[in-house]
Swiss-Prot record:
Catalytic residues (UniProt): 20
Catalytic activity, reaction form: beta-D-ribopyranose = beta-D-ribofuranose
Gene Ontology molecular function terms on file: D-ribose pyranase activity; intramolecular lyase activity; monosaccharide binding
Name of protein: D-ribose pyranase
NCBIfam families referenced in this protein's UniProt entry, alphabetically: PRK11797.1 (NF008761)
Keyword DNA damage attached: no
Source domain of life: Bacteria
Record text on subunit structure and interactions: Homodecamer.
Family (UniProt): Belongs to the RbsD / FucU family. RbsD subfamily.
EC number of the protein: 5.4.99.62
Gene of this entry: rbsD
Organism: Glaesserella parasuis serovar 5 (strain SH0165)
Keywords: Carbohydrate metabolism, Cytoplasm, Isomerase
Entry binding sites for substrate: 28, 106, 128-130
Biological processes per GO annotation: D-ribose catabolic process
């Protein structure tokens, strides 16, 4: 049995095959995901698993150089935004790098999300609890 954090085979495979600047979207239960997009659906019930727990698990195995958020999160869901930014600060300390943070309109976020290597759907039922993680290199 795998010893490290992520036990989900699909998610572990996607992370292992990501290269520099590849994107991985972690989203709430409501983000539209095109049929042709590689979707790793972790949603079990409302809130399970939650967005931040999935982000923390993914960040334990993925070196992150940049994140993209929908700018609407600032006004509509500032609680999740602040919690997410705290997690990003913790990741920066662990990785010993600065993670670039970019805010874009939600419609543009959906377009960029469609370009990601995969979308990880959580059970989060909180508006704009979505992030695109861009892979960096740990050297």
């Amino acid at each position: 049995m795998k010893k490290t954090t992520i036990l989900n085979a699909q998610l572990s495979h996607v992370i292992a095959t990501m290269g520099h600047t590849d994107g991985l979207t972690i989203c709430d239960a409501g983000l539209p995901i095109p049929t042709e997009q590689h979707c790793i659906d972790l949603a079990l019930t409302k809130g399970i698993p939650d967005f931040l727990s999935v982000l923390q698990a993914v960040s334990s195995e993925l070196f992150i150089e940049k994140i993209v958020l929908a700018e609407e999160i600032k006004n509509i869901n500032p609680q999740i935004e602040q919690q997410l930014l705290m997690v990003i600060q913790q990741i920066e300390v662990q990785q010993k790098n600065t993670i670039k943070i970019e805010y874009i309109p939600h419609n543009e976020f959906k377009h960029q999300s469609n370009q990601a290597k995969a979308v990880v759907r959580t059970g989060e039922c909180s508006p704009y609890a979505n992030v695109i993680l861009y892979s960096g290199v740990p050297f």
